[in-house]
Protein backbone atom coordinates (compact mmCIF):
# COMPACT_ATOMS: atom_id res chain seq x y z
CA UNK A 1 0.00 0.00 0.00
CA UNK A 2 1.15 3.57 -0.67
CA UNK A 3 1.47 5.32 2.68
CA UNK A 4 2.39 8.71 4.11
CA UNK A 5 3.74 8.34 7.65
CA UNK A 6 3.49 11.06 10.31
CA UNK A 7 5.52 10.74 13.51
CA UNK A 8 8.29 12.38 15.50
CA UNK A 9 9.93 10.68 18.55
CA UNK A 10 11.80 7.42 19.07
CA UNK A 11 8.50 5.64 19.77
CA UNK A 12 7.55 6.12 16.12
CA UNK A 13 10.75 4.72 14.59
CA UNK A 14 10.05 0.94 14.85
CA UNK A 15 6.62 1.62 13.37
CA UNK A 16 8.12 3.53 10.45
CA UNK A 17 10.71 0.79 9.92
CA UNK A 18 7.96 -1.84 9.69
CA UNK A 19 6.07 0.23 7.13
CA UNK A 20 9.23 0.64 5.04
CA UNK A 21 9.72 -3.14 5.10
CA UNK A 22 6.14 -4.01 4.14
CA UNK A 23 4.73 -1.11 2.11
CA UNK A 24 5.68 1.89 -0.03
CA UNK A 25 6.29 4.92 2.18
CA UNK A 26 5.81 7.90 -0.13
CA UNK A 27 6.78 10.57 2.40
CA UNK A 28 7.32 11.23 6.08
CA UNK A 29 5.84 14.19 7.95
CA UNK A 30 7.57 15.11 11.21
CA UNK A 31 8.11 18.07 13.50
CA UNK A 32 10.69 20.73 12.55
CA UNK A 33 14.25 20.38 13.85
CA UNK A 34 14.44 21.66 17.43
CA UNK A 35 17.26 23.02 19.64
CA UNK A 36 18.56 20.27 21.95
CA UNK A 37 21.06 20.16 24.82
CA UNK A 38 23.02 22.87 26.56
CA UNK A 39 24.41 24.17 23.28
CA UNK A 40 20.88 24.31 21.81
CA UNK A 41 21.96 22.66 18.58
CA UNK A 42 19.23 22.21 15.97
CA UNK A 43 18.52 18.49 15.94
CA UNK A 44 16.32 16.43 13.60
CA UNK A 45 13.65 14.16 15.04
CA UNK A 46 14.40 10.41 15.26
CA UNK A 47 11.78 9.83 12.56
CA UNK A 48 13.46 12.29 10.19
CA UNK A 49 16.81 10.59 10.70
CA UNK A 50 15.30 7.19 9.90
CA UNK A 51 13.51 8.49 6.80
CA UNK A 52 16.70 10.06 5.47
CA UNK A 53 18.52 6.72 5.78
CA UNK A 54 16.05 5.35 3.23
CA UNK A 55 15.91 8.39 0.97
CA UNK A 56 12.27 9.08 1.80
CA UNK A 57 11.05 12.68 1.27
CA UNK A 58 10.57 14.52 4.58
CA UNK A 59 8.11 17.35 5.25
CA UNK A 60 8.44 19.43 8.43
CA UNK A 61 5.63 21.97 8.61
CA UNK A 62 5.55 24.33 11.59
CA UNK A 63 1.77 24.25 11.20
CA UNK A 64 0.39 21.31 9.26
CA UNK A 65 -2.80 23.22 8.45
CA UNK A 66 -0.76 25.62 6.35
CA UNK A 67 1.02 22.88 4.38
CA UNK A 68 -1.53 20.07 4.11
CA UNK A 69 -1.74 20.35 0.31
CA UNK A 70 1.93 19.33 0.06
CA UNK A 71 1.08 16.14 1.94
CA UNK A 72 -1.93 15.33 -0.20
CA UNK A 73 0.13 15.87 -3.37
CA UNK A 74 1.71 12.46 -2.68
CA UNK A 75 -1.76 10.90 -3.12
CA UNK A 76 -1.40 8.26 -0.38
CA UNK A 77 -3.84 5.38 -0.13
CA UNK A 78 -3.43 5.48 3.66
CA UNK A 79 -1.95 7.89 6.19
CA UNK A 80 -0.46 6.42 9.38
CA UNK A 81 0.36 8.58 12.40
CA UNK A 82 2.25 7.69 15.57
CA UNK A 83 3.09 10.40 18.11
CA UNK A 84 3.27 13.08 15.44
CA UNK A 85 2.65 16.04 17.73
CA UNK A 86 0.13 18.18 15.83
CA UNK A 87 -3.61 17.98 15.25
CA UNK A 88 -4.16 16.70 11.71
CA UNK A 89 -6.73 18.81 9.78
CA UNK A 90 -9.93 17.31 8.41
CA UNK A 91 -8.82 17.91 4.82
CA UNK A 92 -5.98 15.44 5.41
CA UNK A 93 -8.05 12.95 7.42
CA UNK A 94 -10.67 12.65 4.68
CA UNK A 95 -8.38 12.40 1.65
CA UNK A 96 -6.86 8.86 1.54
CA UNK A 97 -9.12 6.03 0.28
CA UNK A 98 -8.26 3.89 3.33
CA UNK A 99 -8.38 6.84 5.70
CA UNK A 100 -5.96 8.05 8.34
CA UNK A 101 -5.12 5.72 11.24
CA UNK A 102 -3.17 6.30 14.41
CA UNK A 103 -1.03 4.09 16.66
CA UNK A 104 -1.79 5.13 20.25
CA UNK A 105 -0.06 3.78 23.38
CA UNK A 106 -3.09 2.95 25.52
CA UNK A 107 -6.22 0.84 25.51
CA UNK A 108 -8.62 3.54 24.36
CA UNK A 109 -10.82 5.13 25.52
CA UNK A 110 -8.50 5.15 28.56
CA UNK A 111 -5.58 7.58 28.55
CA UNK A 112 -6.26 9.84 25.61
CA UNK A 113 -3.55 12.47 25.22
CA UNK A 114 0.19 12.94 25.04
CA UNK A 115 1.43 11.01 28.11
CA UNK A 116 -0.47 7.70 28.20
CA UNK A 117 2.55 5.60 29.20
CA UNK A 118 3.52 7.88 32.08
CA UNK A 119 -0.02 8.09 33.41
CA UNK A 120 -0.78 4.38 33.25
CA UNK A 121 2.28 3.63 35.41
CA UNK A 122 1.60 6.52 37.80
CA UNK A 123 -1.94 5.23 38.28
CA UNK A 124 -0.64 1.77 39.16
CA UNK A 125 -2.25 0.03 36.19
CA UNK A 126 -1.40 -3.65 35.74
CA UNK A 127 -1.76 -3.41 31.98
CA UNK A 128 -1.95 -0.91 29.16
CA UNK A 129 -1.62 -1.54 25.45
CA UNK A 130 -1.80 -0.35 21.86
CA UNK A 131 -4.85 0.91 20.01
CA UNK A 132 -5.02 1.36 16.25
CA UNK A 133 -7.86 3.72 15.46
CA UNK A 134 -9.14 6.06 12.81
CA UNK A 135 -8.05 9.64 13.33
CA UNK A 136 -10.77 12.12 14.23
CA UNK A 137 -10.78 15.88 14.74
CA UNK A 138 -11.22 15.28 18.48
CA UNK A 139 -8.01 14.07 20.14
CA UNK A 140 -7.69 10.26 20.26
CA UNK A 141 -11.46 9.85 19.92
CA UNK A 142 -11.73 7.96 16.62
CA UNK A 143 -13.25 4.52 16.15
CA UNK A 144 -10.92 1.68 17.16
CA UNK A 145 -9.80 -0.91 14.60
CA UNK A 146 -7.65 -3.14 16.82
CA UNK A 147 -6.11 -3.36 20.27
CA UNK A 148 -3.52 -5.44 22.08
CA UNK A 149 -2.91 -5.44 25.82
CA UNK A 150 0.58 -5.33 27.35
CA UNK A 151 1.27 -6.14 31.03
CA UNK A 152 2.92 -3.61 33.34
CA UNK A 153 5.10 -5.13 36.08
CA UNK A 154 6.65 -3.47 39.13
CA UNK A 155 9.99 -3.60 37.30
CA UNK A 156 8.69 -1.51 34.40
CA UNK A 157 9.17 2.20 33.94
CA UNK A 158 8.37 4.62 31.11
CA UNK A 159 11.38 3.49 29.06
CA UNK A 160 10.69 -0.24 29.25
CA UNK A 161 6.99 0.23 28.49
CA UNK A 162 7.83 2.66 25.69
CA UNK A 163 10.01 0.01 24.05
CA UNK A 164 7.49 -2.80 24.54
CA UNK A 165 4.58 -0.75 23.23
CA UNK A 166 6.47 0.55 20.23
CA UNK A 167 7.30 -3.01 19.17
CA UNK A 168 3.73 -4.19 19.74
CA UNK A 169 2.48 -1.17 17.82
CA UNK A 170 4.54 -2.10 14.77
CA UNK A 171 3.23 -5.69 14.83
CA UNK A 172 -0.40 -4.73 15.38
CA UNK A 173 -0.27 -2.04 12.70
CA UNK A 174 1.00 -4.52 10.12
CA UNK A 175 -1.87 -6.93 10.88
CA UNK A 176 -4.41 -4.11 10.87
CA UNK A 177 -3.35 -2.78 7.46
CA UNK A 178 -3.62 -6.29 5.98
CA UNK A 179 -7.15 -6.57 7.40
CA UNK A 180 -8.04 -3.14 5.98
CA UNK A 181 -6.86 -4.20 2.53
CA UNK A 182 -8.84 -7.43 2.76
CA UNK A 183 -11.94 -5.71 4.13
CA UNK A 184 -12.06 -8.07 7.11
CA UNK A 185 -12.00 -5.50 9.93
CA UNK A 186 -14.61 -3.13 11.33
CA UNK A 187 -13.99 -0.11 13.50
CA UNK A 188 -15.79 0.14 16.85
CA UNK A 189 -16.77 3.52 18.26
CA UNK A 190 -15.23 4.44 21.61
CA UNK A 191 -17.43 4.67 24.70
CA UNK A 192 -17.18 8.35 25.61
CA UNK A 193 -18.44 7.65 29.13
CA UNK A 194 -15.31 5.58 29.79
CA UNK A 195 -12.81 8.07 28.38
CA UNK A 196 -9.92 9.14 30.62
CA UNK A 197 -7.14 11.54 29.81
CA UNK A 198 -3.35 11.65 30.01
CA UNK A 199 -2.21 15.16 29.04
CA UNK A 200 1.47 16.00 28.83
CA UNK A 201 3.22 15.88 32.20
CA UNK A 202 3.20 19.16 34.14
CA UNK A 203 6.01 20.33 36.40
CA UNK A 204 3.95 20.03 39.55
CA UNK A 205 3.41 16.33 38.85
CA UNK A 206 7.14 15.71 39.30
CA UNK A 207 7.02 16.57 43.02
CA UNK A 208 6.77 13.69 45.50
CA UNK A 209 3.96 14.31 47.98
CA UNK A 210 4.92 12.41 51.12
CA UNK A 211 1.32 12.50 52.34
CA UNK A 212 0.57 9.82 49.75
CA UNK A 213 1.10 6.13 50.56
CA UNK A 214 4.41 4.54 49.59
CA UNK A 215 2.82 2.50 46.80
CA UNK A 216 1.58 5.63 45.03
CA UNK A 217 5.02 7.25 45.32
CA UNK A 218 6.71 4.08 44.04
CA UNK A 219 4.44 4.23 41.00
CA UNK A 220 5.17 7.93 40.56
CA UNK A 221 8.93 7.33 40.56
CA UNK A 222 8.58 4.65 37.88
CA UNK A 223 6.10 6.75 35.93
CA UNK A 224 8.57 9.64 35.77
CA UNK A 225 11.66 7.62 34.82
CA UNK A 226 13.73 8.31 32.74
CA UNK A 227 11.94 11.61 32.10
CA UNK A 228 11.21 14.00 33.70
CA UNK A 229 12.22 12.22 37.00
CA UNK A 230 10.33 12.70 40.26
CA UNK A 231 11.96 14.79 42.98
CA UNK A 232 11.74 16.09 46.51
CA UNK A 233 13.58 18.83 48.39
CA UNK A 234 16.32 18.44 50.98
CA UNK A 235 17.49 21.68 52.62
CA UNK A 236 15.71 23.52 49.81
CA UNK A 237 17.64 21.74 47.05
CA UNK A 238 16.20 19.28 44.57
CA UNK A 239 16.87 15.61 45.07
CA UNK A 240 15.76 13.57 42.07
CA UNK A 241 14.59 10.07 42.94
CA UNK A 242 15.46 7.60 40.19
CA UNK A 243 14.67 4.38 42.01
CA UNK A 244 12.75 3.52 45.15
CA UNK A 245 10.89 0.60 46.68
CA UNK A 246 7.98 0.14 49.03
CA UNK A 247 9.13 -1.72 52.15
CA UNK A 248 7.33 -3.51 54.95
CA UNK A 249 6.89 -1.70 58.23
CA UNK A 250 4.81 0.94 59.97
CA UNK A 251 5.46 4.30 61.56
CA UNK A 252 3.72 7.14 63.38
CA UNK A 253 6.02 9.89 62.10
CA UNK A 254 5.28 12.93 59.97
CA UNK A 255 5.18 12.19 56.22
CA UNK A 256 8.53 13.03 54.63
CA UNK A 257 10.51 12.29 57.81
CA UNK A 258 13.67 10.21 57.37
CA UNK A 259 13.23 7.05 59.44
CA UNK A 260 16.55 5.31 58.77
CA UNK A 261 19.68 5.44 56.62
CA UNK A 262 21.23 2.06 55.84
CA UNK A 263 23.31 0.28 53.23
CA UNK A 264 20.04 -0.40 51.42
CA UNK A 265 19.05 3.26 51.13
CA UNK A 266 17.12 6.09 52.78
CA UNK A 267 13.82 5.12 54.41
CA UNK A 268 11.18 7.86 54.35
CA UNK A 269 7.84 8.06 56.14
CA UNK A 270 4.84 8.21 53.80
CA UNK A 271 1.09 8.51 54.24
CA UNK A 272 -1.00 5.84 55.97
CA UNK A 273 1.99 4.68 58.01
CA UNK A 274 3.83 3.31 54.96
CA UNK A 275 7.53 3.52 54.12
CA UNK A 276 9.41 4.24 50.88
CA UNK A 277 13.10 3.39 50.53
CA UNK A 278 15.07 5.67 48.20
CA UNK A 279 17.75 3.57 46.49
CA UNK A 280 19.05 5.69 43.57
CA UNK A 281 19.03 9.48 43.88
CA UNK A 282 20.54 12.51 42.19
CA UNK A 283 21.46 15.62 44.18
CA UNK A 284 21.22 18.95 42.38
CA UNK A 285 24.11 19.46 39.95
CA UNK A 286 25.43 15.91 40.36
CA UNK A 287 25.04 12.49 38.78
CA UNK A 288 22.62 9.84 39.95
CA UNK A 289 24.16 7.44 42.49
CA UNK A 290 23.16 4.67 44.85
CA UNK A 291 21.68 6.34 47.92
CA UNK A 292 24.11 4.56 50.24
CA UNK A 293 27.03 6.24 48.43
CA UNK A 294 25.73 9.61 49.60
CA UNK A 295 25.68 8.35 53.16
CA UNK A 296 29.41 7.53 53.33
CA UNK A 297 30.57 11.12 53.84
CA UNK A 298 28.99 14.30 55.18
CA UNK A 299 25.35 14.34 54.11
CA UNK A 300 22.04 16.06 54.94
CA UNK A 301 20.01 12.87 55.44
CA UNK A 302 19.87 12.78 59.23
CA UNK A 303 17.20 10.62 60.82
CA UNK A 304 14.31 12.88 61.78
CA UNK A 305 14.86 15.41 59.00
CA UNK A 306 11.80 16.03 56.83
CA UNK A 307 12.14 15.88 53.07
CA UNK A 308 10.02 18.09 50.88
CA UNK A 309 10.00 21.15 53.13
CA UNK A 310 10.05 24.32 51.03
CA UNK A 311 7.55 23.23 48.39
CA UNK A 312 4.72 25.66 47.84
Swiss-Prot record:
Out of the domains of life, which is the source?
A: Bacteria
Residues engaged in binding (6S)-5,6,7,8-tetrahydrofolate: 106-109
Which keywords has UniProt assigned to this entry? Protein biosynthesis, Transferase
What InterPro entries does its record include? Fmt, Formyl_trans_C, Formyl_trans_C_sf, Formyl_transf_N, Formyl_transf_N_sf, Formyl_transferase-like_C_sf, GART_AS, Met-tRNA-FMT_C
Catalysed transformations (reactions): L-methionyl-tRNA(fMet) + (6R)-10-formyltetrahydrofolate = N-formyl-L-methionyl-tRNA(fMet) + (6S)-5,6,7,8-tetrahydrofolate + H(+)
- Asked if Chloroplast is a keyword of the record, the answer is no
Question: What cellular-component terms does GO give this entry?
Answer: cytosol
**GO MF term list:** methionyl-tRNA formyltransferase activity
Q: What is its EC number?
A: 2.1.2.9
Q: What family is this protein classified in? A: Belongs to the Fmt family.
HAMAP family for the chain: Formyl_trans
Q: What does this protein do?
A: Attaches a formyl group to the free amino group of methionyl-tRNA(fMet). The formyl group appears to play a dual role in the initiator identity of N-formylmethionyl-tRNA by promoting its recognition by IF2 and preventing the misappropriation of this tRNA by the elongation apparatus.
Which NCBIfam families does the protein's record reference? fmt
Query: What is the name of the protein in this document?
Result: Methionyl-tRNA formyltransferase
Organism of origin is Shouchella clausii (strain KSM-K16) (Alkalihalobacillus clausii)
Amino acid sequence: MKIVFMGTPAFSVPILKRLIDTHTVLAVVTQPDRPVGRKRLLTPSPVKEEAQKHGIPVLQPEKIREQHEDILAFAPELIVTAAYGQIVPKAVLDAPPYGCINVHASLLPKYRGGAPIHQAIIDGEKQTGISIMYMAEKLDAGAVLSQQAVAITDEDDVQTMHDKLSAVGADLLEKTIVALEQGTIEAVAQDEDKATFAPNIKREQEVLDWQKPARALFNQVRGMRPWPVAYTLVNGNRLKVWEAKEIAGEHECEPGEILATTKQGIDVACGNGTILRLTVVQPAGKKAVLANQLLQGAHPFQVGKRLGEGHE
